[in-house]
Amino acid sequence: MLRRILTTSSVRNLTSSTQARVGIPFVIDNEGKGERTYDIYSRLLRDRIVCLMTPVDDFMASALIAQLLFLQSESSKKPIHMYINSPGGSVTAGLAIYDTMQMISAPVATWVIGQASSMGSLLLAAGEKGMRSALPNARIMVHQPSGGAQGTCSDIVIRAEEITRLKKRLNEIYVHHTGISYDEIERTLDRDRFMSAQEALKFGLVDKIEKHTGSMPTD
């Protein structure tokens, strides 16, 4: 039974891209005859809850993938709950998370709180059908991938072709998870498209809008 929450004065590096440093809360959990201290993310992991609360980069993706694989090894049937509040980021890092979500047999329920933009919106849509949720004031943004290139003309052409291939693949993934036609997905993603929770529901990115119930879903 959870008893107390402490705040540590130590700091941890949460993302390699922003080098953000914040104090990580610790909790004290009563277990049988004794107590055990966890950082808050480890404690949530015990309840099969993982958090994507930063830009998507290789460092964050590695940590999140490791958590998904660990929870899959613990139970291949119990749901995993992924909470998303992310502006997006690296396409390749996001696709690594996406492929892991699709590979494991444990269903992944996705929840957007705050925002799910760019790759964040794709990972939101990639949750188990019927288990993709938005909180009432969440914002979702979809768009096509972007990037730059420099060097010789040949190098620039190669890079442009790769971005075009990634754009096509991302469009196909959105089609698969939303049920919307490829042409409509391509038109929608041509520019930044911001959506409310209700608009994301209509678009097929989420299955429901959660009301504030005061309880946190677990397995």
UniProtKB/Swiss-Prot annotation:
Catalytic activity as recorded in UniProt: Hydrolysis of proteins to small peptides in the presence of ATP and magnesium. alpha-casein is the usual test substrate. In the absence of ATP, only oligopeptides shorter than five residues are hydrolyzed (such as succinyl-Leu-Tyr-|-NHMec, and Leu-Tyr-Leu-|-Tyr-Trp, in which cleavage of the -Tyr-|-Leu- and -Tyr-|-Trp bonds also occurs)
Keyword Protease attributed: yes
UniProt cross-references to InterPro entries, sorted A to Z: ClpP (IPR001907), ClpP/crotonase-like_dom_sf (IPR029045), ClpP/TepA (IPR023562), ClpP_His_AS (IPR033135), ClpP_Ser_AS (IPR018215)
Assembly: Tetradecamer that assembles into a two heptameric rings with a central cavity.
Pfam family, one: CLP_protease
Biological function: Clp cleaves peptides in various proteins in a process that requires ATP hydrolysis. Clp may be responsible for a fairly general and central housekeeping function rather than for the degradation of specific substrates.
Keywords: Hydrolase, Mitochondrion, Protease, Serine protease, Transit peptide
EC number: 3.4.21.92
Family: Belongs to the peptidase S14 family.
Gene: clpp-1
Subcellular location: Mitochondrion matrix
Major place of residence: mitochondrion
Species this protein is from: Caenorhabditis briggsae
One GO MF term attached to the UniProt entry: ATP-dependent peptidase activity
EC top class named in words: hydrolase
PROSITE patterns: CLP_PROTEASE_HIS, CLP_PROTEASE_SER
GO CC, alphabetical: endopeptidase Clp complex; mitochondrial matrix
Active-site positions on this chain: 118, 143
GO biological process terms, semicolon-separated: mitochondrial unfolded protein response; protein quality control for misfolded or incompletely synthesized proteins
This protein's name: ATP-dependent Clp protease proteolytic subunit 1, mitochondrial
Source taxon at top rank: Eukaryota
Transit peptide: 1-23
